[in-house]
Amino acid sequence: MNETVVVTGGGTGGHLKVADAFIEEFYNRGISVIFIGSSNGQDKAWFENDKRLEKAIFLDTRGVVNKKSFGKVLSLLNIFSKTMQCLKLYSKYNVKTVISVGGFSAAAATFASILKFGCKLYIHEQNSKMGKLNEITSKFATDVFSSFDENSLVKDYPVAKEFFNTARVRDKIKTIAFFGGSQG
């Protein structure tokens, strides 16, 4: 059975656009990809019917940060349960590589990659301040990629090829606008 790569993460457009760029690159190289995200947040809207994916899985997960004490306990128990579900999936599909782009959607799949013997975890951190999940799991990662870390092997932000294919050179620039943020 061929190896399958898992791309995980999301919740907001900032994480999902990076996941999309990874999926596109793997797809173009003929590598089978499974996306694991959350049924809460924007993940389903982005990848539910994506033909590039071997499978798209949306777990009923929620974040832990900003929850009250009992809510945190319930979220952590839920993450544990979903981590076990991901471990079974990794065995079924011979997953040996997981790419995490962070966000609460990535927790279960990321923890499962740490628990699975022989599975490599790669983390892409797109924010200038590392998110809590990436901060915790980076100690177990094979490598962490970040534009903001001087020690990072890869500093580039993944960009879809269509950006370069549709770009045009203008003689005169009238206005430049920048958009972004955690909501995409």
Task: Kindly give the residue locations of the regions a language model identified.
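Short amphipathic alpha-helix
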Residues: H15-F26
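Conserved nucleotide-sugar phosphate-binding/catalytic loop shared by glycosyltransferases and other
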Residues: N2-T12, Y27-N78
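Cofactor-binding loop segments of dinucleotide-utilizing enzymes, especially the Rossmann-like FAD-
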Residues: G10, S38-N40, T61, Q126, ...
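Conserved donor-binding/catalytic core segment of Leloir-type glycosyltransferases
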Residues: R170-Q183
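Short beta->alpha connector loops at strand-helix junctions that form conserved
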Residues: F58-R62, V101, H124-N127
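Glycosyltransferases and closely related glycan-assembly transferases
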Residues: E3, N49-E54, M84-I99, A107-Y122, ...
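Active-site-proximal region of nucleotide-activated glycan assembly enzymes
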Residues: I31-S32, L53-E54, I114-T166
